[in-house]
Amino acid sequence: MDYNRMNSFLEYPLCNRGPSAYSAHSAPTSFPPSSAQAVDSYASEGRYGGGLSSPAFQQNSGYPAQQQPSALGVPFPSSAPSGYAPAACSPSYGPSQYYPLGQSEGDGGYFHPSSYGAQLGGLSDGYGAGGAGPGPYPPQHPPYGNEQTASFAPAYADLLSEDKETPCPSEPNTPTARTFDWMKVKRNPPKTAKVSELGLGSPSGLRTNFTTRQLTELEKEFHFNKYLSRARRVEIAATLELNETQVKIWFQNRRMKQKKREREGGRVPPAPPGCPKEAAGDASDQSTCTSPEASPSSVTS
C-alpha cells in the first residue's frame, strides 16, 4: 500500500485538527512508519502550522493527555491513547493547544489560542469587549438622567410661573335695582303631593315650584296686564323656560287671589272706562278691552 499517497489526503486533518481530530474509540493505536515520515516532511517545510520539525517529532514519544472542552481557555480532559507526537505550529511557538469554536468535536472547528488572544486584544481596545477597556465608543448613558432632570427643573418652574394667571380684580359692586312693593314675592313652603295607595301621586296633584326669578317676572307682567293674549303668553313661557299651560294657570290663580283680597278689603276697584263688567270675570282668559296701565306689548283685540 502506498502510504505516501494516502498521507497527501490526510495532511490537513493531521496537521490542523491536532489531537482532537479522532475520538478515543476510532483513533488508531499507532501510525505506520511511512505516515510518520510524511508528517515530519510536511512539518519541516512549514506548509502547515500543525507539525514540528523532524528532530522535535522524533524526540517526543507520545501526546499529552487530551482534554474535553469545558470552557473557553480550559484545556481538554484526556480521552485519546498515548503514542503520538505532540503537534505544534512551529519550533518557535512550543506545544499548541486547541479550543472548539462553539461546535461539536466532529465539526472540526478549532482555533489556536495565540491568534485568539491577539484578536481579543484588538477587540478590547477597539470595541471595549465585555464592557472593559476604553475604546472609541464611550459607554451609553440613559437619555434622561438625574443631571438632565435637575437642569430641566428651573425651566419647568419658569413655565409654570408664567402659566399662572394673576387673579382678575374684583369688579365694583353694581348698584341693585330699585325694588317696589309689588315686586316682592312671599314664598310659601312647597307642599308635597300625597302618596296614593299605589305608591305615587297622580301627575295632576303635583304643584309647580316656580323659582324666585320666574315669580318676579310673572308679577311684573301681572302688574301691567292682568289678561294675556296667546302670543304674549307663549313669549313669556319661552323666556321663563315654562310651558304655556303653566303661565295660563298662574295668571288665573293670580286673578282669583287679587279678587279675594279686594273682597276682604271691602272695596271694589273701579272698572276701566269702556270695558264691560262681564269681561272682568274669570270665565275667560282673554279681554276685549285695554287697560290704561297695560304695556304696549300686551294689547289684545
Curated annotation (Swiss-Prot):
Motif (Antp-type hexapeptide): 179-184
DNA-binding region: 203-262
Protein name: Homeobox protein Hox-B1
Name of the gene: HOXB1
Polar residues biased stretches: 26-38, 55-70, 284-301
Presence of the UniProt keyword DNA-binding in the record: yes
Keywords: Developmental protein, DNA-binding, Homeobox, Nucleus, Transcription, Transcription regulation
Residue ranges of the region described as Disordered: 20-77, 127-149, 255-301
Compartment(s) where it occurs, according to its Swiss-Prot or TrEMBL record: Nucleus
InterPro entries in the record: HD, HD_metazoa, Homeobox_CS, Homeodomain-like_sf, HXA1/B1/D1
Gene3D superfamilies: Homeodomain-like
PANTHER family membership: HOMEOBOX PROTEIN HOX-B1 (PTHR45946:SF5), HOMEOBOX PROTEIN ROUGH-RELATED (PTHR45946)
GO molecular function, one term: RNA polymerase II cis-regulatory region sequence-specific DNA binding
Gene Ontology CC annotation, any one: nucleus
